[in-house]
């Protein structure tokens, strides 16, 4: 009789334990990142350095030893606050990113900081963005770049084991090149060369061939110097398309110079006048139109 009473009690206890196990919720980790500075952004290598405060709060114990920094490494960690429910660390890190150079040199990039739990998957621990403790210092300056936005969100990432994913807190900061410095540094020298070359069409002497040949070589050298600042990519950048139009313009002017020289040797003044007239009618409008169409693509 005693055994009959004990069995229902044991069964009820086992069922209750199983129910508790099935309803176990993952550990909630509130994470906030406040960036105090960025530096050494190298587009060619896709690397940058950063200093930021990492603030963690959770009902269960969590420390910096439980956190993995993705796509980078921590170079120094200083503990600011260390209480059971709240951790605050000042971290210096070297990070990497994948630059998008389609619009180079009017390119913009995202500087990401991503963290995840080293050992617990998303069924055991999940991140929640602590918006009150997330931000960017207003005095942060990255020479040659302008900050124009930031975001923070949580996502899950699956690694080699497709049945297991990890919660990841992602903080992104968007930068773009300063427009005025880009125009002065990249395009002003090229535009001066193009203007001089187009103005040479007004010259009716054969001496313009030497001028345009020099302008063509100067454009090649400037292009080589500018393009050397970025890695090799498998697509045409804005600068590449700009230089294609530039080479086409300079090439047409050089060809007209060669034709003019050949006609001058043949003493065919009528044909020289015709070549000069049609060169002025076709080359400048075509060149300006192509440049305008190219710059309009930046608005898309």
Give the location of each predicted region.
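A residue-level signal for conserved active-site and pocket-lining positions in enzyme catalytic cores
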Residues: 8-10, 255
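Bacterial N-terminal signal peptides
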Residues: 1-8
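Channel- or pocket-lining gating/hinge segments that regulate access to a cavity or pore
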Residues: 170-286
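Short, functionally important structural connectors and interaction interfaces within domains
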Residues: 2, 30-33, 93-98, 195, ...
